[in-house]
A protein has these predicted regions:
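Cytosolic regulatory regions of ion transport systems
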Residues: 1-183
């Protein structure tokens, strides 16, 4: 818009055209937010050759990430046309990588309008909103505080000589108990 105004062009009147990020996205992962967590997720997806598109509202981050070869687009993930352009309805998974509950719930609502079957994974600081998110249609909630605790205890047990298989089994058992100890 700024470039158009600088050239003396007038912004178009009426509704802006819907974004079109890519025409061949299917069975991909949509990453909502491309900060530290979103970038880490993308790095692992890329290493496994799993297609993804990331969406972020920071134009500098988007530009720099695109220059580095990342499939990142500018857009507010609470806007239906942005998620539609990212082909949420054809994706295998939507990841909400920011830990803001209200914003996450808005995104979940829009995703569910576009697809009632796509899996949704949400990052949260803790499990405070676990039931609300699950009831809204979230497939999995990842509470940072518990995951950090599980990682720490894994290292403690490993350094204390506990076999890796037993550590993995115990950690999985704790996750299966659905994070109830954090209240």
């Amino acid at each position: 818009l700024a470039k158009k105004l600088a050239r003396g062009e007038r912004p178009e009147q009426g509704k802006a055209a819907a974004p079109n990020f890519s025409t061949n996205l299917t069975n991909h992962v949509v990453i909502c937010g491309f900060g530290r967590v979103g970038q880490t997720v993308a790095r692992f997806l890329k290493a496994e050759a799993i297609p993804y598109i990331a969406l972020d509202i920071d134009p500098i981050r988007v530009r720099e990430s695109q220059a580095a070869g990342e499939n990142v687009q500018f857009g507010h993930v609470r806007q239906k046309d942005i998620l539609k352009a990212a082909k949420v309805d054809k994706s295998r998974l939507v990841i909400i990588s920011f830990a803001d509950y209200a914003k996450a719930m808005s995104v979940v609502s829009v995703v569910r309008q576009l697809s009632d079957s796509v899996k949704i994974l949400v990052r949260m600081r803790d499990d405070k909103y676990l039931m609300e998110l699950t009831n809204a249609g979230v497939t999995e909630v990842v509470p940072e505080s518990l995951e950090a605790s599980l990682m720490l205890v894994s290292h403690v047990l490993f350094m204390s000589g506990v076999p890796v298989k037993r550590i993995l089994r115990r950690v999985q058992q704790e996750r299966t108990n659905r994070y109830g100890i954090l209240h």
